[in-house]
Amino acid sequence: DFEALARAGLTLTGVPTDLGGLWQGPAQSARPVAMLLRKLAGVDPSLALVASMHPTVLLMWMTGTVDGGPVGWKKHRDGVLGMAREGHWFGTIASEPGIGGDLLATKATARPKDDGTWGMSGDKFMGSGSGMTSFMMTVAVPEGEQRPDIFLIDARDLAWDGSQGLKMVRPWDGVGMAATQSHAFRFDDVRVVRHGLLGGALDLLPQIGPVIGFMFSAVFVGILDAAAAEAKRILGKRALQLSAFEQSSWIKAQNQIWLAQQAFEGMARSLETDAAGTDVLHGKLAIADLAETALNGLSHAVGGASLSQSSPFGQWMQDVRALGYLRPPRALSYARILGGLAS
């Protein structure tokens, strides 16, 4: 599937137009890229979620200055984005146990090596796309510094048995987004490359954070699109024969899906006007809550058949729960919104 998507050009969503890609900036490209992910999610949510991480990770290299920056930045940037142009997939393994999704709270460390690379050590999980992605973005604190930075792992020939410092300690066993291969790993001096802005990459998060939340939300709106269509296929011809409870459950769920779709549209417009602010946080939280409630309502309307493994509703109900945990997770989103209200 990933090879087919690369051949179709989807990896170019993480490459700017000046280097032969499709990305023109959030205002021009966020909506069309998100719509691709939304359509894909209606067929395979796990595939779409992993694919959504490709352009969002590469925003760390597409955003900001091109010709300025530290010595070697442009060469580093062109090299990373050139790999995406060649069809390589990028993913992320930045999450860690006990930090609540806050990248700045990382416990991982990195020490410089003689050849200019770094050796990273620490525990990481939620490595979505493990085995499918060629490169993985991560976060660690450089030796002798206080603030974390972005690092890139070349995962193409990296064994998982500990022989090269990387050991899988827990395979992904999620009941939702079951096929994302979001394994947990222990890093012991694994070779990584530091981001070329040398400490400046995390300063880009306020700019790119809304785009990340929007792309993730697109996947879950795609699930809602598919769920609404499937419910109509099953229930449409016998709508008047449904019980009052089934009818009201269906109508309420449809209203909730409509609201989620409007929230998504509002997020897109905010990005297109460069005034995203907390709008995307509100939209992502709204979609997360509405999606869970809507899938529950559709299950009530469809009945016990929705629990069958031959029905997609049971899997969709688990899949949509993931949005609240994706960056920024609910706790951080609430904290940022509260900070804005209190200021």
Regions found by a protein language model. Give the residues of each.
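A short core secondary-structure module
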Residues: D123-G165
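Glycine-rich phosphate/pyrophosphate-binding beta-alpha loops
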Residues: F125-S130, I212-F216, L323
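Amphipathic alpha-helices that form helix-helix packing interfaces
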Residues: S217, L224-A227, A231, A253, ...
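C-terminal helix-coil-helix/basic helical segment that borders enzyme active sites and/or dimer interfaces
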Residues: G236, L240, W258-D289, S299-S308
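Short, charged, amphipathic alpha-helical segments
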Residues: A244-I251, G277-H282, S311
